[in-house]
Amino acid sequence: MKSFMASPATIERKWYVVDATGHTLGRLSSEIAKVLRGKNKAIYTPHIDTGDYVIVVNADKIKVTGKKMDQKIYFSHSDYPGGVRETTLKEMLAKKPEDVITLAVKGMLPKGPLGRSMLNKLHVYAGPEHNNAAQKPEVLEIKY
């Protein structure tokens, strides 16, 4: 008997919505990355994007442990000499809370074209409202 290999024609994608209120950043991001990769499905195939769509609401109400709010630093570079910019987690949550979850999940996905296609299925919103109601998302319970 041959092993089952998923193909793009055999994949059925669902939409899930996750409320980030009170959840720890890393634990929540890990669960989201599993769903985006499709590791929670029986048809998981490593070289095919078998994952589902995930909508995250209330990204500005995420929590972190310890002193990460002041000590965690995000780096970006403008490609010019001396163009390094540093932003703390506290500043990032004030300006762009969506990017905090997006960057955490991005680091947990494969690098390359497959990982980028998986990341495109993630939709993060700072507030409680999202504009994906037409997709009829199911609530994804995070159990910790």
UniProtKB/Swiss-Prot annotation:
Part of the 50S ribosomal subunit. This is Large ribosomal subunit protein uL13. CDD domains: Ribosomal_L13 (cd00392). It comes from Lachnoclostridium phytofermentans (strain ATCC 700394 / DSM 18823 / ISDg) (Clostridium phytofermentans). Belongs to the universal ribosomal protein uL13 family. HAMAP family: Ribosomal_uL13 (MF_01366). InterPro entries: Ribosomal_uL13, Ribosomal_uL13_bac-type, Ribosomal_uL13_CS, Ribosomal_uL13_sf. GO terms for cellular component: cytosolic large ribosomal subunit. GO terms for molecular function: mRNA binding; structural constituent of ribosome. It holds the Pfam family Ribosomal_L13. SUPFAM superfamilies: Ribosomal protein L13 (SSF52161). Keywords: Ribonucleoprotein, Ribosomal protein. This protein is one of the early assembly proteins of the 50S ribosomal subunit, although it is not seen to bind rRNA by itself. It is important during the early stages of 50S assembly. PANTHER family: LARGE RIBOSOMAL SUBUNIT PROTEIN UL13M, RIBOSOMAL PROTEIN L13. NCBIfam families: rplM_bact (TIGR01066). The keyword Lipid biosynthesis does not apply. One of its GO terms (biological process) is negative regulation of translation.
